[in-house]
Regions:
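Positively charged, low-complexity terminal tracts
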Residues: 1-80
Length: 80
């Protein structure tokens, strides 16, 4: 059975969260997958954006809730 081609369009790059040793970036972008609605997307991307790792896509409503939940969160308070 042939692999289904996944289409994507990076509509806007918001920023890079981290870069790993192999040069892949964990990025926040606005991405349209398979001609669907553009969503905020957090995932790892190869240096040329040809290869893509697993990630998470969020609707506008989910992003609004996430912002609210993180508003008072201090990542430096968490014990490691």
């Amino acid at each position: 059975m042939p692999k289904t081609e996944i289409k994507y369009e990076i509509v806007k790059n918001i920023g890079i969260l981290a870069t790993n040793k192999s040069g892949w970036n964990r990025e926040i972008n606005i991405v349209r997958w398979n001609d669907g609605k553009a969503k905020v997307d957090i995932r790892d991307w190869g240096p040329d954006h040809e290869k893509v790792g697993k990630g998470l896509s969020l609707s506008s409503e989910e992003v609004a809730v996430l912002k609210e939940l993180l508003a008072d969160y201090d990542p430096y308070e968490v014990e490691e």
